[in-house]
Amino acid sequence: PLDRAPESGAAVVLLNSDELAHETALPGLDAVLHHTPSARDAHVCKAEVRSNCLSGTLALPRGRRDGTRLCCGYLVTKDRVVLVDDGEMAEPYLKHIVKEKRLIENSVGRFLYDFFELLIARDLHRLEEIEDRATALEERVLAGELEEFSTPMSELRKETMAWYRYYSQLDDVACELRENENGYFSDEECGLFRLFEERVIRLREESQLLREYCTQIQSLFQSEIDIRQNRIMQILTIVTTIFLPLTLLVGWYGMNFSGMPELHWKYGYPAIILVSVAVVAVSYTHLRAHETPEHL
């Protein structure tokens, strides 16, 4: 944190949540610092406009290696930006901006534009990776490999939904910046925020297409399952149709009434066998004649 106000130029202050909690005041930010959200409170992307500042949070759908999400809080005044980051989200972007010498004096808006642009710089590549995983899953379904489908499909659907929600929220943030209610940004900077908003909208459309693609793959999987179940039911129907007359025959002669002459006929047993074989042959021939070629 700063221990004195800068003499000139815009200042970017990077804190973590503990430093924010113990920092009672920063030079030039005494009246607004309490509006700064901590990184621990960052669960969505949002921007809240107040009379003397603009504050909000950023929460990325991707996370760190330990599985925790990349989040930060931020506060914007006319000449100052405060970022609250507990992990590895904001600091790498700040270093990149400094390295590329993009930190222009008296240009909070330009810094915010560069920062937000870095947030989405590789997102199209990440969405393409998700699409590749979805395509591989679709190819497995088409190849009849339906085992272990539900878990990766569920992960893909949750992931695409997270990215879509993220871009929808980020679009709202870009809209707040572009509207410039506090008058912090120049017309040129508002134009940059408009460009950023358009890129976010395109990424949101890409994520929506991925969501629809995952839904199509899920439908394809369900269709394959239904086809397999239909084949099983067809086999059971054929077996039942063939053996139902035999069941009737067995039940009929199983009553063993004394008045049944076939029971005492020496050819009765072979005759029943021949009748059963004939019934099976006739039933099978009839079913084959009425089956479509793909069911034979």
Per-region residue spans from a language model:
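Conserved small/polar residues in nucleotide/adenosyl-binding loops
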Residues: 285-294
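Helix-termination/interfacial motifs at the ends of transmembrane alpha-helices
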Residues: 248-267
